[in-house]
């Protein structure tokens, strides 16, 4: 039971926009926080003092920045949430990252403000199945090639699997779902071979 949570966070991001966190209270979006580069304090204030389930999720892609939680303090008690016993590892592109879901039209210049993985199928399906989602999604990624403009004829095979996989995963996922191939169409362009 608490009225506020104080976070000390270090954020590392690129020129494509800030790392964005979503704060959920009892599975409802409560607040979004655009993290500033470097180490900063953030306070989440609740209007009433009651038992609640709070989740803090990075909703932007790891390739555009990440955060480190240095400290967490509260005026109440914190107890660990029992995470689901099953998990799904989702490997995908912008569709899995939720890019473009925060805008009426797809923006011409990439910016992290236009993505939210909690509005994309990997997160939503995981919630419906009550499994832990592990989402590794990189906009522009493909199997044969990353996205390329129409003026290019050669595939862009830099930073495709396995080089983009961020770490040796400590989780042992129950299932793995790979949702890649959409960006390959920018290279294959309907070529039959």
Predicted feature locations:
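N-terminal secretory targeting modules
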Residues: 1-91, 95-114
